[in-house]
Amino acid sequence: GVSSAASDVYKRQVNMLDIAAGGPGEFSKRPFLKAHISPLISPMRYGEDAVDVVYECIKHNIPISCITAAQAGATAPATLAGFLTQSLAETLASLIMVHAIKPGFPMVFSNWPLVIDLRTGAFSGGSGETAVLNAASAQLSNWLNLPSGVACSMTDAKAIDAQYGMEKGITSFAAASAGGNLIYESSGMTASLLGVSFEAFVLDDEMHSNTYRALRGIEVNEDNLGYNAIFDAVLGDGHFLGGHHTLEAMERDYFYPKLADRDEPKTWFDNGAEDAWQRARTHAKKILASHNPNYLSKKQDKEIRSRFNIL
């Protein structure tokens, strides 16, 4: 996604995207990114510049994520029910505006309830209130049969530590369990959205993979109930290790993380006693050193660099 408060920026971006897509007008035929816009300024008023951006995006067929990001006790009521009442109305106002300009234009219903610490005014993206508010936002979007975007797995921690894991995990799982379609301000973000980390990117990838696995739930069918496997184990070796039923489940039913430590303590200590941050840093460095995809032709790369201020 892309984001800017100035409509003229999108004109230049579309020119760049056309080069990548194959020529003038090609991006609009098959857009491959969307714009993040906040046309509503809480509480309850349109922002003139942002509305201009909406017009520009519709002109170039750029799908839109219309974001409402009020803050509890500051730009929205401090009560959670009151907050959701206002933010839902604001996001609906964005939808109505887009539909009035061009009926049916693709828009993600992005109601992002945000929380501040009312003692200090500091943004609190990793709070329990943030978790429950964004889960409720996802549920409201589903109730309206609209594609939802919510803010989740944010953290106020500045390091990859226990606070980081606690805050990211609870907000990620809450949004997913509530049926959120898209999540934002998530992977790699730290320090109340003021920081970003390569280590956080790879750790968050595993966190979300675990969340996805939990969402899959438990499939119940005749084979998975395992009657024959239980029979064979009881009358045979007395365990399930190495059995065909176990090996099939191993590949199908389990997620195996690359970074999470599951060694017994002595093995972990003998291997350097690395914590999650250290393991993530090593993994991130390997990716940065080896993963160099080339999505543009040399001609496209040269044209973009000649027309735009890119080093």
Per-region residue spans from a language model:
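Glycine-rich anion/phosphate-binding loop at the beta-strand->alpha-helix junction
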Residues: I37-M207
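Catalytic-core signal marking the mid-to-C-terminal active-site face
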Residues: E199-L311
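Alpha/beta enzyme core
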Residues: I19-R30, E56-H60
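Active-site-adjacent beta->alpha loops and helix N-cap segments on the catalytic face
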Residues: K11-D18, Y46-D49
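Alpha-helical structural signal in soluble globular domains
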Residues: M16-A20, E56, L140, A214
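Hydrophobic beta-strand segments of well-ordered beta-sheets in folded domains
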Residues: S4, P31-H36, N181
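Single conserved hydrophobic/aromatic residue that forms the stacking wall/gate
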Residues: G1-A6, Y10
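Flexible, glycine/charged-enriched surface loops at secondary-structure junctions
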Residues: F27-R30, I67, K102-F109, N145-A151, ...
